[in-house]
């Protein structure tokens, strides 16, 4: 496999399937990641995954990766984490931002993202399918001639 994509999931996403299923859906994060790994394998792309409720662990994973692309759902860190934004900018790896819910249709404090202005694209409101869209876009971008 010639390409690698890092999938980063932020706080509370380990509770998918149990936490507010009317907002976030019934699939678990393990189910979503398994489907994405299969999608990546079919495209001959390696998908590395990290989920953490600890900001520093996400930052360390971003610093350590040798991936050519990142897909990130920063979750609640979307609205608060300059440090996570700086980690992404520091490694200069292109990234897509994903959110399960439509953050713009929710509480006002969720409307601001520290990542959107630097992301290749933002996908929100499509539930777990948003990850599939982001992965397809990342794979397509990686396979484009330089």
UniProtKB/Swiss-Prot annotation:
Sites annotated Transition state stabilizer: 19
UniProt pathway annotation: Metabolic intermediate biosynthesis; chorismate biosynthesis; chorismate from D-erythrose 4-phosphate and phosphoenolpyruvate: step 3/7
Key words of the record: Amino-acid biosynthesis, Aromatic amino acid biosynthesis, Lyase
GO annotation (BP), single: amino acid biosynthetic process
KW Lyase (keyword) present: yes
Catalysed reactions, as listed in the record: 3-dehydroquinate = 3-dehydroshikimate + H2O
Known role: Catalyzes a trans-dehydration via an enolate intermediate.
The protein's name in its UniProt record: 3-dehydroquinate dehydratase
């Amino acid at each position: 496999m010639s390409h690698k994509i890092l999938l980063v999931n932020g706080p509370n996403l380990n509770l998918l399937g149990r936490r507010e299923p009317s907002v976030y859906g019934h699939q678990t994060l393990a189910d979503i990641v398994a489907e994405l790994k299969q999608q990546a394998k079919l495209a001959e792309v390696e998908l590395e995954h990290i989920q953490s409720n600890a900001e520093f662990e996400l930052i360390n994973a971003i610093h350590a990766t040798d991936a050519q692309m990142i897909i990130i759902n920063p979750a609640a860190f979307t609205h608060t984490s300059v440090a996570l934004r700086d980690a992404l900018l520091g490694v200069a790896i292109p990234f897509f931002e994903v959110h399960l819910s439509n953050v713009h249709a929710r509480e006002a404090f969720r409307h601001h993202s520290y990542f959107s202005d630097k992301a290749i694209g933002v996908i929100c409101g499509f539930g777990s399918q948003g990850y599939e869209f982001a992965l397809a876009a990342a794979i397509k971008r990686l396979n484009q001639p330089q």
